[in-house]
Amino acid sequence: MIIPRTGIGVDVHAFAAEGEARQLWVGGLLWPGERGLAGHSDGDPVAHAAADALFSAAGIGDLGTHFGTDRPEFAGASGVTLLAEAARIVRAAGFEIGNIAVQFVANRPKFGPRREESQQVLSDAAGAPVSVTATTSDGLGFTGRGEGISAVATALVYPRLSESIG
């Protein structure tokens, strides 16, 4: 019997300092005119949480293990690139990806009008269905004060049949 595995991933980024030239990337999409997020890579909390959830589900570390700040080759990397690489690593470890679900918490950007576009970009990167939802924290905490964005993701993976026998 093949038993699926679930994982959870979390990512949080503060908005970059005023005047710092950083673009906002959320859900694999560029949000022109919005203040960017601070981070080692592009700071996309949605893509990063999705990648982290994949690693968690496969039991092979986390985002920092694979793409940490000690890895200069990932400085400025796109979240979509990191998600695609995470999916490749998880598959190389003997797993297939069932799906990924992500919820991000922020006052901005307004996500609804671009939800389908984001889901397509992330699904293409992961090679599996990715759904994204957005909410606010009703003015509470750092996201409510507009200081940054957080995201939580779950992933479902299952071992390849050939990997689970014997």
Curated annotation (Swiss-Prot):
Gene3D superfamilies: 2-C-methyl-D-erythritol 2,4-cyclodiphosphate synthase
Alphabetic keyword roster: Isoprene biosynthesis, Lyase, Metal-binding
Record's cofactor remark: Binds 1 divalent metal cation per subunit.
PROSITE patterns, A to Z: ISPF
Pathway terms, separated by semicolons: Isoprenoid biosynthesis; isopentenyl diphosphate biosynthesis via DXP pathway; isopentenyl diphosphate from 1-deoxy-D-xylulose 5-phosphate: step 4/6
Annotated 4-CDP-2-C-methyl-D-erythritol 2-phosphate binding sites: 11-13, 40-41, 62-64, 135-138, 142, 145
InterPro entries reported in the protein's UniProt record: MECDP_synthase (IPR003526), MECDP_synthase_CS (IPR020555), MECDP_synthase_sf (IPR036571)
Top-tier EC class: lyase
Keyword Chloroplast: no
Cofactor dependence: a divalent metal cation
Ligand binding (a divalent metal cation): 11, 13, 48
Record field: catalytic activity: 4-CDP-2-C-methyl-D-erythritol 2-phosphate = 2-C-methyl-D-erythritol 2,4-cyclic diphosphate + CMP
EC numbers: 4.6.1.12
Protein's GO biological process: isopentenyl diphosphate biosynthetic process, methylerythritol 4-phosphate pathway; terpenoid biosynthetic process
A single MF term (Gene Ontology): metal ion binding
Superkingdom of this protein's organism: Bacteria
The family this protein is said to belong to: Belongs to the IspF family.
Free-text function comment from the UniProt entry: Involved in the biosynthesis of isopentenyl diphosphate (IPP) and dimethylallyl diphosphate (DMAPP), two major building blocks of isoprenoid compounds. Catalyzes the conversion of 4-diphosphocytidyl-2-C-methyl-D-erythritol 2-phosphate (CDP-ME2P) to 2-C-methyl-D-erythritol 2,4-cyclodiphosphate (ME-CPP) with a corresponding release of cytidine 5-monophosphate (CMP).
Protein name per Swiss-Prot or TrEMBL: 2-C-methyl-D-erythritol 2,4-cyclodiphosphate synthase
Organism the protein comes from: Pseudarthrobacter chlorophenolicus (strain ATCC 700700 / DSM 12829 / CIP 107037 / JCM 12360 / KCTC 9906 / NCIMB 13794 / A6)
